[in-house]
Amino acid sequence: MDARTDKGYRGDAAQFFVAGELCRRQLVAVITLGNCPNTDILVSNAAASRFCHVQVKTFVPGNRTVSVGMKAEKDFGPTFFWVLVGIPIPDSGKDFEFFIVPAADMARAVAESFRLWASSPGAKGQQRDAVNNKVRTLSLPPRTETNGWSLEPYRNAWHRIINAVAT
């Protein structure tokens, strides 16, 4: 029996779905298969004169949050993007969802939301353990983050990557 989880298959599939969407938009998209730190997909224009890096994270449409991890708090620069991919369960009738977020926007929102979470009391009034907590999540639309930030403006915002590699 295969020990891989449904989440593992979904993560692998997401990289191919994102690469396919980028190729449909006449970009070159190469999946790194884990061979490039912080980069799931390397993207270039057809002339290979401009590049950007894409980190892919997955969720199931209808879920409340997507997990992005601590590295989402780091601004990797203007040529780095996060693509959050909602891959529906087969036969669920739900659509795929894509949110294309520049690293600067992601870093600012995740860090601020985590600071707000850490400074608020827990469910039983206790102080939260911000030092040892490595979890970082984002609320999926229609929900917003504690700081009011929403992923909605990033829905299907493929133009952000297209513009980053434009000549």
What are these model-predicted stretches?
Residues M1-P37, L42-T167:
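Mixed-charge (Asp/Glu-Lys/Arg
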